[in-house]
UniProtKB/Swiss-Prot annotation:
The gene is bamB. Gene3D superfamilies: YVTN repeat-like/Quinoprotein amine dehydrogenase. The keyword Signal applies. It comes from the Bacteria. This is Outer membrane protein assembly factor BamB. Keywords: Cell outer membrane, Lipoprotein, Membrane, Palmitate, Signal.
């Protein structure tokens, strides 16, 4: 019997999965949420305490673009615009400062990812491995099939549209017509987290995480593996105990790239060579964010941690959001910002982890990481709300 856990309630579901004593596994079993478990197995989310608004956060615009469904629709930023998508097929470019619609396109399939964009070309992926590209006015430019499930937003830039499938392939597509330029293939793991694994450009490399706790760099020119490093190693006896996939997008600051894994570690490496700089035991279902001095992440219990980005030493932790299914955090200015499953956006001091502000969106989960367009902080909810804020 295959138990496939859909995205949504990721942190709580994965934590519970790790504690299940008896679970029939199959070679293609996947994890990514909590639908397998009845409500009696779920932890009660912490009640929110009143927060003194030390940081003024002003909502400057909001729009509705359509629901995300069971997928994580991560917004993308290019220039002054933010690009968002909805499960029903809508792709929208918004002015980051005003929320004004710059253009809107419509795919003819349901979508499974957020968009990737370089400002000229915007690409999304949909059901049955469809990859659809739109031009700078929102007109569909091409559509191809990559013959595999895609849960990660395409990465667009450097004359490429990069697509990764859940069966271990990474494809470099021609942005003019969608034809394949190169392919990188890994053997799929028997058990892995069924989640979005964003990729980033770093110079002429593509940095991305893999199942089994690995982080790697691919050449953008031909897809060759330039280096691979271990964020963590499998531990334990059962398949679930040994599950240690890299989670979230790699985080780059200067010459350092960092990543976290589930049931594994948080670790940082030299961006050019993959040489390790530091690592420590940690388990995160959503990944990390960093700035010049700190690295920040939430664990599967929704405890938020601050580490010294240079050596991994403890800075602080905040356990007031237990089991609230936090999304991927963002370091922005003097705050670490993270959304939860009830649509709250929490602002923590990056210096000591104390709350400095909190705002409410539409009440639906914020699973994707916030993004910054100019000075505007933008978040997208599963309910389809996109909100622009100015923290002061």
């Amino acid at each position: 019997m295959i138990h496939a856990l859909e995205q949504g309630g990721v942190a709580r579901g994965i934590a519970q999965a790790a504690r299940v004593a008896v679970l029939a596994l199959a070679a293609t079993a996947v994890l990514g949420g909590c639908s397998l478990f009845s409500s009696k197995n779920k932890h009660e989310p912490a009640k929110l305490m009143e927060v003194q608004q030390v940081l003024a956060v002003r909502q400057v615009w909001s729009v509705s673009v359509g629901k995300s469904g069971r997928y994580v629709m991560q917004p993308a930023v290019a220039g002054n615009n933010v690009y968002v998508s909805a499960a029903g097929g809508t792709v929208t470019a918004l002015d980051g400062a005003t929320g004004r619609t710059v253009w809107q396109g419509k795919a003819d399939v349901d979508l499974t990812t957020g968009p990737g964009s370089d400002g000229t070309l915007t690409a999304v992926a949909g059901e049955k491995g469809a990859v659809i590209a739109f031009d700078e006015k929102g007109a569909q430019k091409w559509k191809v099939a990559v013959n595999g499930e895609v849960l990660t937003a395409p990465l667009v830039g450097q004359g490429l549209v990069i697509v990764r499938t859940t069966d271990g392939r990474v494809l470099g597509l021609d942005p003019s017509n969608g034809e394949r330029k190169w392919i990188y293939q890994r053997s799929p793991s028997a058990l892995n987290l069924r989640s979005s694994l964003p990729m980033i450009f770093a110079g002429d490399n593509i940095i991305l995480g893999f199942a089994g706790g690995k982080l790697g760099a691919l050449s953008a020119s031909n897809g060759a593996l330039r280096w691979e490093a271990a964020v963590s190693y499998p531990r334990g006896v059962s398949e679930i105990e040994r599950l240690n996939d890299v989670t979230g997008a790699p985080s780059v600051n200067g010459s350092q790239v960092c990543a976290a894994s589930f049931q594994g570690r948080v670790a940082c490496f030299d961006m050019s060579t993959g040489a390790p700089r530091w690592g420590r035991d940690f388990s995160s279902p959503t990944g990390v964010t960093q700035d010049d001095g700190g690295l920040f992440a939430a664990d599967e219990k929704s405890v938020v941690y601050g580490f010294n980005a240079q050596n991994g030493a403890d800075l602080w932790k905040n356990d007031a959001l237990l089991w609230r299914d936090l999304g991927t955090p963002l370091a922005f200015g003097r705050a670490v910002i993270v959304g939860d499953s009830e649509g709250w956006l929490h602002f923590l001091s990056r210096d000591d982890g104390k709350f400095v502000a909190r705002v409410k969106t539409d009440g639906s989960a914020i699973g994707a990481a916030p993004v910054v367009v100019g000075q505007t902080l933008v978040v997208q909810t599963r309910g389809g709300g996109v909100y622009g804020y100015l923290p002061k």
